[in-house]
Amino acid sequence: QGKLSNINGLAVLSQALDAEIPQVGTTTFRPPYTPVTIGALAGEARGVIFQPLRQTPMHAWHEANAAYFEPVGLWRRPYCYPRKGESHGQAVQREVLNTREKLGLLDASTLGKIIVKGPDAGRFLDMLYTNMMSNLGIGKCRYGLMCNEQGFLSDDGVVARIDEDTWLCHTTSGGADRIHGWMEDWLQCEWWDWKVYTANVTEQYAQAAVVGPNARKLLEKIGGLDVSKEALPFMQWTAGKLGGISARVFRISFSGELSYEIAVPASHGAALWEMLHREGAEFGAMAYGTEALHIMRAEKGFIMIGDETDGTIIPQDLGLSWAISKKKADFLGKRGQERKFLADPKRWKLVGLETLDSSVLPDGSLAVAAGSNANGQRNTEGRVTSTYYSPTLKRGIAMALVLDGPD
């Protein structure tokens, strides 16, 4: 309804009605004809606003150690820890190699943490996730996918069963509030008579990932918990005192390396972090940031919500059919995924790519095919979703959605 475009429309209308423009009438003039403030265009980029920036309990340590931060939702997370004379790229490569060869420490406190509790909690989670959660054993963990009603992937994370009627659901860092709201929406509007209670406890805990060949050595040195392969197998968790601090230790990995994630009360986060660095010095302990995290997960072939997904991707596109239960009668997104166009064999599927040299593919690059579509645009057969230089493989790597996928 801006004045500039409306005048042209009124001229066409007056001609059709064989009347003058004043006789046809005008509408109320609205932006962009009237002035628009620069602040309205800048949005959140104009400075500190009502929504406060979120910081982990280890934030002061990151600042003291020259971390370069990046925004993750409202969180500020270390992207890398450049040393004097290092570029960000060099710092990231150093962090990846040290984690692969020795010991890396990651502040994972921003990871979403939602408690789901009650007699119907298992039944509720079976509807929320594509796979079964009600049959998860106490003390065990399971990777789960969430889809919206249309069947498209919306979040993923590891679910741990705490006791008979309590589960801890981990979400993506930027998705905790959204997923908690999604849970409450279903409980309040659809399943209001189910006995389920949820609580977003993300900020109640600090979480540190201890990753690499020396990870177990560090925790054994600190003492207090048996973290041996026999006592704590992969995808299980245990609780107790770790170096005198009450902790939950999860044996999960987002890098392919031996890895433990340690959750402690937020007030003990800084103490835990400093203890890990102090006791881990002899094992080559070094903090790493989000970019090193992303590279290592891509080297392993793990997806990341927001990179490999864009609101139009279903689990089957990413080779995650194994995470969809065939036992359940229903779950959110099941009927959506049964639509015919989602079973089209021409849908792009996820693959891993390696460059033949050390070059890195531009993010979002398209695989261009011969011919053009009805709009005159070149046909495409795929696009790059994530791309990095891998110091482990010493070449560019990428993940992409392409026609025919792995086939």
Protein language model regions, located:
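Acidic, proline/glycine-enriched N-terminal capping motif
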Residues: 12-147, 152-154
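Conserved, structured C-terminal
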Residues: 2-6, 39-71, 77-79, 83, ...
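C-terminal, active-site-flanking charged/polar segments
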Residues: 1-21, 407
